[in-house]
Structure formats: C-alpha cells, structure tokens
C-alpha cells in the first residue's frame, strides 16, 4: 500500500475543507450559493424560503430567527448561532440590511462568553422590589412585541417540530416582569435594558406531557444580554417547573394521549428513552 498517496489525499482534503470555510467566513455565511463544498465536508445548505418548494425542515424556526434579528437592529440580513438544543440558547452576531457589508473584523460567537445558567423563579414577595423588578403593563405588552417573540422562541426551542403558527396564535401572556441589576428611572426604561431577565406567565397552549390544558398557567424565563463591544445579542430561556419525565412507567407512556398524538401526526415521539436533547447546536443564516 502506498502510504504516501493516502497521506497526500488526506492533506488535499484538509486543504480543500479549510479553503471552503475560509470563503464562508469571508462572506460571513451569506450569499453562499456559489461556494461549493468539497466532497466529505460538512456543508452549509442554502434555502430560498420565498419559494413554495424550498422544503426547509423548520420554516417556523426560520421565521422566528429572522424576527430575532429584526428585534436586534430592525434590519434584514441575519446570522443566528444556535448554541444548544432542548432550550433557547442563541446568539445573533449579525443583523443588517441585505447586501451591506462592513470592513470590521467579524468576531466569532465563541469569543462571546456568557453564563448558560438561568436564575431561579423569584418568590412572590421578591417581585414587590421595585428597584429590581418592573411589571409590564397590558398596553406595553402590545407595544413591545419582542416579549411575545421571546416566549415563542422558548417554546419552539423546546418543542421544535411539535409546534405550529396556529399553536403560537393561541398564546396569552398573563403577566410579564422584567428584572435588571440596576435601578432605572423611569421604571419602564427596563423595557430597553441591554441586560435583563424577563419572567413570563402565560396560557393558551396545552401540554399533555405535564397534564396542562390551555387554561393552565405556565412559566418561562428569558435572559437577554446585548454586548455593545461585539454587537452580539444573546438570548437564553427555558420553561420553568416542567419536568417532562419523572417516574414514568413505559406501558403508561406508550399508551398516553401525548405519544399517540405524535404518532398520528407522524412526529418523532418524545420519550425518556429517546433523549435527543444533547447536541452541539447549529448555525442558521437568513436572507
């Protein structure tokens, strides 16, 4: 066997892969249709979501990621880095008008180090601390639709293929409270805080796995961090108090309404024996 030939082939493959990712980095992962991936490389796949036959596997997720970019800078070209699965954990490093480039050096998301732990849900008395918390008024909820967006992102991050636009349209925010480390004057300035934690109580979306009907009030926490140096927006969120699989008998589970509903709709069933929540995340570029 000619080991020299094998070594040379491997070096050529590594060089081709490095060149491919160099070209992607130069384009910041936008307009990549003309960049061809070498054989065997892990490639980015472009989708034209305006075409009826684009067949993106998660169209609702694309819509919400685009909304996250619009929320960041109200612009049109968005790069979203999904850091983990099973909960909301994303960074939006780019949000700008489509076709516009900058001469600034792109700062990778890995350089934006943030804690991935959420705070505990505060006690009822703690919410009365006006120097830390601000209870969002009903009129302010209507004028700050990013709060609803955060909730939708959390639900989609956890349920992903099991949720639709029609499901999200049923959501009703019962109460939203914003916490900041520093006191802000006037208090509603917390709505614009670059670093904040949002506590949301909501209803309208049933969850058979925790025996929760549409009128059952559920809780979500979302932490927002905007880094002024890098321009990166970080969103971390999860549902609170919803341990999905605790002391479940297999016979009971596989005959449960939740499991049968997944099978009926040809969805991959969620179970404690098919745990797919551990992963490395993904990167989505949206034009």
UniProtKB/Swiss-Prot annotation:
Transmembrane segments: none annotated. It holds the Pfam family protein_MS5. Signal peptide: none annotated. Belongs to the UPF0725 (EMB2204) family. This is UPF0725 protein At1g19060. It comes from Arabidopsis thaliana (Mouse-ear cress).
């Amino acid at each position: 066997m000619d080991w020299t030939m094998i070594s040379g082939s491997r070096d050529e493959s590594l060089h081709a892969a490095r060149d491919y990712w160099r070209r992607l980095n130069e384009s910041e992962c936008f307009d990549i249709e003309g960049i061809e991936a070498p054989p065997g490389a892990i490639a980015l796949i472009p989708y034209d979501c305006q075409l009826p036959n684009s067949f993106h596997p998660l169209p609702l997720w694309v819509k919400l990621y685009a909304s996250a970019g619009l929320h960041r800078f109200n612009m049109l070209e968005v790069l979203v880095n999904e850091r983990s699965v099973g909960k909301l954990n994303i960074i939006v490093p780019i949000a700008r008008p489509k076709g516009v480039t900058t001469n600034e050096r792109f700062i990778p998301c890995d350089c934006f180090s943030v804690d991935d732990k959420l705070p505990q849900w505060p006690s009822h008395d703690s919410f009365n601390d006006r120097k830390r918390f601000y209870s969002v008024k009903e009129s302010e909820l209507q004028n700050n639709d990013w709060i609803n967006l955060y909730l939708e992102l959390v639900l989609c991050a956890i349920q992903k293929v099991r949720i639709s636009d029609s499901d999200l349209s049923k959501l009703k925010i019962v109460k939203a409270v914003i916490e900041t480390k520093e006191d802000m004057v006037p208090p509603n300035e917390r709505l614009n805080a670059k670093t904040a934690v949002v506590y949301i109580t909501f209803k309208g979306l049933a969850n058979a796995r925790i025996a929760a009907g549409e009128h059952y009030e559920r809780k979500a926490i979302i932490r927002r961090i905007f880094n002024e140096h890098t321009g990166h927006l970080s969103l971390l969120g999860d549902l609170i108090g919803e341990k999905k699989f605790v002391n479940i008998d297999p016979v009971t589970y596989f005959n449960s309404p939740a499991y049968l509903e997944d099978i009926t709709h040809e969805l991959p069933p969620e179970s404690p024996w098919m745990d797919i929540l551990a992963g490395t995340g993904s990167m989505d570029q949206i034009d």
